[in-house]
Amino acid sequence: MSTRDLVLVALFAAIIVALGLIPPVNLGFIPVPVHAQSLGVMLAGVVLGAKRGTLTVALFMLLAAIGLPVLSGGRGGLGVFMAPPSGYLYGYIVAAFVTGYMSERLVTARQTGLVQGSYFFVAAVAGGVFACHLCGVLWLAFVTGLGLPAAFMGTLAFVPGDVLKALIAAFAGRAVMVGYPLLPQRA
């Protein structure tokens, strides 16, 4: 891994942390807050690709695990990894990988801007929405005993916001591809 890769991983981990400063919103009917950090996970996958995006999220999770208050709401420490919303945190790693992998495979420099943006959006939805929510629902059902149908129904409230975040990530991925073409997509 080059110095450039390390800097990009650290930069995007810092972006995820910064997005955690936006106060989370609790909906009340499910014990999972709505926050902006999942946007950072999608951005890491879309912009950095599978390897560096996954390493970015792994670094972010390590910072949270050692107790730094990097999660939304100023949370950190090993205890947050056992709480009901922890499945979504585990899903961040899967989300970054899936988003990055699909972005690397679907998006090429020869495509038109609309096609690139559409593929970035598909990748962000597949990783940042489907993969992350799958991990979150499975963990939520396991920890709370809700059962899969109830956990799934509870997570549906978050899907529209996450689709909006995927759209933002797609626009950002397209902008980076146009504005900074020297950033290698594959590492």
Residue ranges of predicted features:
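Interfacial aromatic-anchored transmembrane helix boundaries in multi-pass membrane proteins
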Residues: 20-33, 61-95
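Alpha-helical transmembrane segments and their cytosolic interface
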Residues: 1-7, 150-187
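Hydrophobic transmembrane alpha-helices
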Residues: 1-54
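Hydrophobic alpha-helical transmembrane segments
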Residues: 6-11, 35, 39-43, 54-59, ...
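Structural signal for membrane-spanning alpha-helices in multi-pass inner-membrane proteins
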Residues: 16, 20, 24, 45, ...
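Short helix-perturbing small/polar motifs within transmembrane alpha-helices
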Residues: 18, 78-132
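Interfacial helix-loop-helix junctions of multi-pass membrane proteins
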Residues: 68-74, 138-153
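Alpha-helical transmembrane segments and their lipid-water interface positions
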Residues: 53-60, 68, 99, 136, ...
